[in-house]
């Protein structure tokens, strides 16, 4: 009797998984994409309150983080797929946003270091006011029009000043409604009110957070911590049996979620 139940369980399970994988195969055939664990958009403040030396410290913080082989070896590579996609945007006033490094696949230490070199080659494009909402509005369609697919899409905003709370929160809410999973913040400076502003108006989505670098000199260490938190996968809460089915279930679940994300991206392109 137990053998019969086990056999029926396996048969039903494999039928379900096969159906899921078949649907995934048909979906991916219509929309070619590179699958990654996370799509991460880095939004870096270059408003007039940031001096040239402070801009260089910000830039160097990201360069050092992606140059560090530990980021890939102990964090990116530990994901289900072992890859991420990332871009970098400089932002300031309402009409001042620039994607200075386009969407890049990080699938090796070399790729991570090449991304660091690309950041290092960037120059400051402008230095006007501080409009966080417009930066988020600018970043969102770039996520939905890239050539990557993931289960987690994250926008990260770093800055040393606040902007209009209503427009900032509205941009955050619109990005989340469009399908972005989380918006995180990195506050530069030791201001409690600025931290609270980011916490209340910028941060949003499941697993989102705000970190604070008390000085620009602390920025590099905080960036490294932030990237690790954004990249690392959460451990599974349960361990189903038998083990041979775990991979099939995981792939099936990834396919279902990614298919939904893909539909959102296709709709955004129309």
Label each residue range with its predicted role.
Residues 63-71, 93, 124, 140-148, ...:
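Sec-exported extracytoplasmic/periplasmic mature domains
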Residues 34-100, 102-152, 154-158, 184-195, 218, ...:
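Von Willebrand factor
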Residues 161-201:
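VWA/integrin I-like adhesion module and closely mimicked acidic/polar interface patches used
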Residues 256-270:
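C-terminal membrane-anchoring or membrane-association module
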